[in-house]
Amino acid sequence: TGTFYRRRNELIFYSDVDFHRPIIIRNKKDFKIEHRTKAVLDIIKYKDPLETKISAVLGKEHEKGVDIDAMLYENNVRINFNEHIKKEVKKLDQVVTEKDRMNRVDYRMLKTVTIDGDDARDFDDAISIEEDEQGYILYVHIADVSHYVKKNSAIDKEAYLRSTSIYLADRVVPMLPFELSNGICSLNPNVDRCTLTCKMHIDTEGKCTSYTIVPSLIHSDQRCTYAKVNALLENDPSVLAEYDNVKDLLLRLEKCARSLQEKSMERGCIDFNSKEAKIILNKNGKPVDVQLKSRGFAEQMIEECMILANVCVANYLHSHSLPCMYRVHEDPDPKKVYSLCSIADILHEEINFDPEHIQAKDIQLLLEQVKD
């Protein structure tokens, strides 16, 4: 990628990457190129001078989104979906059919919510919770994408190549077509959706005593946001009317999550409670501010639920000898541990662990000491 600038009476291309050699553009006359036009070149021959052709004109460099477009092209991000994928998508139903409902546990009678950020557009997990004499029954519902995306289909192969959705300041480049990610595979409110559900029995001490994992059917009652759930948990009257239908569920979920969190801390779980930076753009797509997004307990509730569901699934896969990649954390670098000890010493904080054999619990206690 690069930009054309007019120098005297000639348009000169300035590449974003310095190739240390002149560039010849074979098809410049085929495009309407003006001063400050951003474009993408394909290299035809690696020689001196470099032989290229224009493959895309992105627009003027100051126009909204052109800088992001250039970055995506520069990093070979797959943006568009080909015709084979579009044809497969057209064949997919955008509503749950009777055939889809077969062989699924029906959880549509459960009060169910999604909780995500204000700007979320696709919802891939939902929560239900009940209370009984032993404690809680927690349901984590995950969108059953595999029901719609079949192995070795064009959509599946494209998702494999993309690996993940890419979240940018002004857009999302999805792993799946929007008809799936924002449509039939998104757990939108007031519609039936196919899911995989991890149903977990949790005692009053926050211990998961049993679980089951089943194909399921849900019907989300409400799309909640972290900001408003946090407001509800803080007894803000401005959200009571909007969340009246799911208030009991959210308060029950809060109690359950706190017991899960306490159990995690007993095991030595480390809570770094880091803040995420969010770039604020103006109407022209230019960055004007960077704000820190703080995590309230609503975010922590969902985190606790998802971690527990992941642990249950990992245990299930392990107990059934199914191949799986487990996400684990390596032991910390001893040099960094000694650096940490040096900083703690400067702060006059007491170190009560052996740097050569540090445990997660040790880091947790140190963080607790210095959190103020």
Where are the predicted features?
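Covalent nucleotidyltransferase
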Residues: 130-132, 172-234, 242, 252
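Append "with occasional cross-activation on large, charged helical scaffolds in nucleic-acid assemblies
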Residues: 201, 213, 226-372
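Structured core elements
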Residues: 40-42, 53, 112-114, 126-128, ...
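Short acidic-glycine loop/turn motifs at beta-strand connectors
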Residues: 7-8, 47, 131-133, 202-207, ...
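Charge-lined substrate channels and their catalytic hotspots, especially those that engage the 3′ end
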Residues: 1-142, 146-191, 230-231
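A short, sequence-level motif marking secondary-structure junctions
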Residues: 27-31, 56-60, 214-220, 294-297, ...
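A short, compositionally biased
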Residues: 6-10, 194-196, 273-276
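Short glycine-/polar-rich loops that comprise or flank the Walker A/P-loop
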Residues: 162-163, 194-196, 321
